[in-house]
Structure formats: C-alpha cells, structure tokens
Amino acid sequence: MTSANDKSTDTNVDSTQAEQKMAEKQNKLLSGIIERATKSGIGRKKLNPSAVESAVAKNMAEIHNNPTKLRLVVLGGGSFGTAMANLAARNGCDTTLWVRNKRTVKAMAKSQMNKKYLPGYKLDDRLKYSHELQAAVKDTDIIFIAVPGLAFRETLKSIAPFISGQSIVSLTKGMEKDTFALMSDIIKEELPEVNFGVMSGPNLAIEIMKNMPSATVIASESEPLRHAVQAALHSAFFRVFASDDIRGVELGGALKNIYAIAMGMAAAYEVGENTKAMILTRGLAEMSRFGVHAGANPLTFLGLSGVGDLYATCSSELSRNYRIGNMLGRGMTIDAAVKKLGQTAEGVNTIQQVHEKATKEGIYMPITHALHAVIYEDKAALGVALHLMEAGFRSDVEFVMEHDHSNASLTAQMQTANNQAKNEKTKPDNK
C-alpha cells in the first residue's frame, strides 16, 4: 500500500525530471540555433546573397537534428581580447584564446591569468589557450580578431588557408596605416567570401573584468551573426546591442581615439568642465561629419559606438589614448609617450590618417588638424588651441532637416488636410 507521503515524493520526482528534460531540450534548441546562426553556408566558394539566405534558412530548419554549443576563438591576448574570451567561456561557449607566444600561453594556462594586460583578474576555468593558429581556428563557428590594427591584415592572411565556413568578427578599432582601410575593408579584401561583423562600444576591459555593467554593439549585415554574437557574449553585466551600420559603428570606434588624446592633453593643462564639454561635443560633430562623408548613418554616432564610446574614452584615465594625450600635455614626445605606455594606442595613427583624408576631401576637422600639428609638426599646443578658439563662425548642430524644407512640408500637409475637410463638407447628403 502506498502512503500519501510516497505519492507526494513520486510526484515531486516526476516533476523534477520533467523540468530537467525541458531545460535540456531548451538548451539543445538554443545551442542549435546559435550554431546554425553562425553558419551561413559561406566557405571559400563565393556565393550570391540569395544563395547565402537559402543556406541560412536550410541550416535554421535543421536546428533540431545536430545541436551543439557555440565554438569560438579569440585571436589576440591583449586586454580586450582576453576580456571577451573570458566572457564567452563564462557563458558556456567552447572558447579558445590564441596568443602568438608559446611561453605566454603556458603561463596563462598555469596561472589562469593574463598577468601582462589584466594582472590580478582570474580567468574562467573553462577558457582554453593555444599558440597554434591552425588548431585554434579549425572547427570554430566564429573567429574574433582582437590584434592591433598593424597586424590585422597579416592575421587574416595567416588564417585564410583554414577558413571553411567560419564567421569573422573584428574587435580591433582603428585604421590601417598608409591605406586608410578600416578593419571591415581589410576583411573584404583578404577574405571576400567570409560572413563578417564588427564590434565596438564603450568597453574598457578592466571594468568588464570587474563585472561593472557595460554594453557594446555588434554590426553586421547578417542578422544570424548578430544574434549569435549576442547569445555568446550577453550577460547580466554585459549587454550586446545590434546594428547593420558597419561603417558607422566602426568609424565611431576608430575616430573617438582622436578626441581621447585631445581630452588627455586638456586634462594635463587642468582645464575646466566647460572646455571638456566643448571638446566632447565638437569631437562628436567631427566624427559624424566625417562618418556621413564615408557613407555612415549620422544617427549611429548618437549610440553606444559613437557618443557612448567617445564619452568613456575621453573621461577615463584607463583609456590608452587618454593617457597618451595626458603625457603629451605634460611635455613628453610622442615616441617617449608610446614607449612608456607599453601598449598600442590606435589614436596616434588615426590622427595622421584622418588628417590626410580630411585635407584631401575637404572635410572640416579642426580638432584633428590641431592634434596633427602638435604631434607631427612640432607646433606648440597652447598656440594651436588659441588658433582653434579664434576660428571663424560655424553652426552648432548639423544633419538636421532645413527649416524652410520642414515648414514647406508641414504647410503642404496641413493644406491637403484642409482641402480634404472642405471636400467632405461639400459632398451632397445621401440620406
């Protein structure tokens, strides 16, 4: 005879087992979606957009048949690359961090720490490490590239023989020296068949490692890739937003470094809040002006990858470009400042590239030109700043609808509505 307690126990066991099975089913479904989302059927063979869409649809339809968790590799063991690899591993992704130096890999695996760039921050136990490029890249779904801009093209060439359907996401901010190419341009040149995206935002690596709430933007023309990156990195402390404006998101991440250097220099002179606000907002104006000229959506610069990244980089002493600017403001040469920093500050190269491009194309970039004069032409910073303040009159806000056009449009709409109302009144009564 079965007691009431026995029946209650059996019911609880059955309920627990059912919940476990449901959770397993949901996990399998999600992991399958993630993998299929990153597989758009693009290998070394060049496909047209409709074929890619068909491949994505086919893969999504097969999500129940071959579920597996997302497999990632992050190329580059700097602070941000390490932080992203750690975040993905913590989210349960099969994640490998590739670092070129074998000795560094052994040290990181042993200590579970990146002592050079993130000392004192323990990395997730599940994170794997490798110095062998082929082994790290093979059989992955997404390749995140977090190497300095100077090494970006060479890295793509190195992994080209091992690409067999993986998607690529650039974490590198800046422009290639001498070519003015953004990282997305380099991807299209070196691996034209690959599905790709770029990620950028106000992402100071140390704050991410401290679990301070942060957010970023993944930009790609591939919606499945955007969703996959969100699934891989999104957490209670790190939110991933999506965009399809690759140009705007990438330019925001590259151009803001210029104004971080300017803000660092200003801080060295102990300027007031008015001056800081002026540099920040006029820097944003330059970013959006340059971005629109390059084909970006000006509204993108009002988001995380624009004003968000600009604010974080310009207001934090953790920013490498801010620190470079601060050292320059205290009288150090650019070479000495870069050497003391010990890390790559992409803004130094970006200033030169944007100055040349803006001069050639006639884009109004006064702060950029002023920084170029100080860093590369050995001009006195205070003299250049005074010249900036004495520049001619300009409008404040750009990229808004002209008032005449706006009023004319509104007047036309009101007139149309008025005419329709009159017509309704003059219609004969059919009652």
UniProtKB/Swiss-Prot annotation:
Sn-glycerol 3-phosphate binds at residues 173, 201, 256, 309, 319-321. Gene3D superfamilies: N-(1-d-carboxylethyl)-l-norvaline Dehydrogenase, domain 2, NAD(P)-binding Rossmann-like Domain. The active site is at residue 256. Keywords: Cytoplasm, Lipid biosynthesis, Lipid metabolism, NAD, NADP, Nucleotide-binding, Oxidoreductase, Phospholipid biosynthesis, Phospholipid metabolism. GO terms for biological process: carbohydrate metabolic process; glycerol-3-phosphate biosynthetic process; glycerol-3-phosphate catabolic process; glycerophospholipid biosynthetic process. It catalyses: sn-glycerol 3-phosphate + NAD(+) = dihydroxyacetone phosphate + NADH + H(+); sn-glycerol 3-phosphate + NADP(+) = dihydroxyacetone phosphate + NADPH + H(+). Pathway: Membrane lipid metabolism; glycerophospholipid metabolism. NADPH binds at residues 79-80, 100, 173, 205, 320, 346. Residues 1-19 have a biased composition (Polar residues). Its EC number is 1.1.1.94. It holds the Pfam family NAD_Gly3P_dh_N. Its main location: cytoplasm. Residues 1-25 are annotated as: Disordered. SUPFAM superfamilies: 6-phosphogluconate dehydrogenase C-terminal domain-like, NAD(P)-binding Rossmann-fold domains. InterPro entries: 6-PGluconate_DH-like_C_sf, 6PGD_dom2, G3P_DH_NAD-dep, G3P_DH_NAD-dep_C, G3P_DH_NAD-dep_N, NAD(P)-bd_dom_sf. It is an enzyme of class 1 (oxidoreductase). The keyword Secreted does not apply. It is found in: Cytoplasm. One of its GO terms (cellular component) is cytosol. PANTHER family: GLYCEROL-3-PHOSPHATE DEHYDROGENASE, GLYCEROL-3-PHOSPHATE DEHYDROGENASE [NAD(+)] 2, CHLOROPLASTIC. Belongs to the NAD-dependent glycerol-3-phosphate dehydrogenase family. Catalyzes the reduction of the glycolytic intermediate dihydroxyacetone phosphate (DHAP) to sn-glycerol 3-phosphate (G3P), the key precursor for phospholipid synthesis. This is Glycerol-3-phosphate dehydrogenase [NAD(P)+]. It comes from Psychrobacter arcticus (strain DSM 17307 / VKM B-2377 / 273-4). The lineage of its organism: Bacteria, Pseudomonadati, Pseudomonadota, Gammaproteobacteria, Moraxellales. The gene is gpsA.
